[in-house]
Amino acid sequence: VVATVTEEKRMRENWNGVAIVDLSREFLNSNGAERHADVHVLPGTVWQPQWAGSTFAEKLENLVGDLNVCSQKGLGERFDSTIGASTVLMPYGGKYQLTPTMAMAAKLPVDGETTTCSGMAWGFNPYLTEADPYRGAYMAVVESVTKLVCAGFRHKDMYLTFQEYFEHLNTAPERWGKPLAALLGALDLSLIHI
């Protein structure tokens, strides 16, 4: 037995005969203590990709030498992608097995065989998001949804989840403006187009 539902408006948890948790239903409904913050969203700036070099050849060489762009096949070959026996897509595809897979697909764990799978993809450009959190989050949704659609998933069946990585916010309204702008960018695209 994990839990027993009673008519009492309290959530109680016992361990070895000792009550270790005793919370009122009103507190649970409140989602904790109420908090407020002042927020000021600064206008975003334009991000223009820049690569070191004076000629096209130098810029291209610096671009493909960037760890965010270069091939990660050697690293991927060090891991067994078939562990768990539910993987649908291999890490690399194409005629020569050199094209990285842009999404993850795995069969659902059920008894017997299944033709149903779940998919997952991500999108994020740290440079764009640093310059304009609203546009960065907006484009992160575009990128992740596009990857899944290209992998064969229907955009109407997708659920979005968001992870945020921002500096410690303290009480500075401008700092609070960054996650708010990112949330609004992701929400804007999600409500209108997906």
Model-derived features: where do they sit?
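Glycine/proline-enriched, intrinsically flexible loops and inter-domain linkers
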Residues: 1-192
